[in-house]
Amino acid sequence: MAHSPLTVGSGDHHVLALHGWFGSARGWGSLPDYLDGSAFTYVFMDLRGYGDRQQAGGEFTKASHQVLLQAPDRVRKLVGINPVPATSVPMDEQGWALFSGAAAQAGNRAAIIDFTTGNKLSKTFIDQVVRHSLDHSSVGAFGAYLRSWATDDFSSSLKPDHATPVKVIVGETDPALSAAVMEQTWLVFFPGAELTVLANGGHYPMFETPVALATCIEEFLGRE
């Protein structure tokens, strides 16, 4: 099946949107409804193994993190939404068992979503995110991306003096990729980066606080 990215808007400022582990091009909640389509053109893409690209072969890596390294002159700004760092993500034995079992076990996926949103959201919401991830990703890709974002480390290749403006956004109830984690990783690799903590939300602000997320993204992207 041909890949059909979701395009929102027709503005002059183009934005490539890459989803997370449980997402897809069409798994951004209601965020697209609150974006400024007159100023921006957003292209929501499926990663290999997700959405329309579930049958795509090749490697499943967090190579998208290396866009600034590969083509710095083509990136005007970078926004990370609850992003994993360029380093590996340390886990204890229990944590690894939970995450590595998520490819085959829907219950593990639900537990991860519940944990990373502060154990405060409804079962209906959690079940919907789990269902979307099951329907829009292949088991092989889901497992392979975990191994990449949890164990790959290319932080030594990053240049602290990079001039590209960087914004990092996290939710206050996400205990896994918290503000403290960003301060120890992203803000070290990109010393000029900005960090915003969104209130009343965790790891999925596109569902939990979409208006605040859209506002934060576009305030940063829209600056001269």
Regions found by a protein language model. Name each.
Residues 1-16, 33-41, 136, 151-154, ...:
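Alpha/beta-hydrolase fold catalytic core
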Residues 2, 32, 37, 41-69, ...:
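Active-site loop/oxyanion-hole signature of alpha/beta-hydrolase fold enzymes
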Residues 18-20, 170:
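The conserved beta1-alpha1 loop
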Residues 20-30, 42:
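Serine-hydrolase catalytic-loop signature spanning alpha/beta hydrolases and amidase-signature enzymes
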Residues 70, 74-106:
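Flexible "cap/lid" loop of the alpha/beta hydrolase fold
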Residues 88-91, 105-161:
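Conserved alpha/beta-hydrolase catalytic His-Asp/Glu region
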Residues 165-201, 207:
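Conserved loop-alpha-helix segment in the C-terminal half of the alpha/beta-hydrolase fold
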Residues 207-219:
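Post-His helix in hydrolase/transferase enzymes
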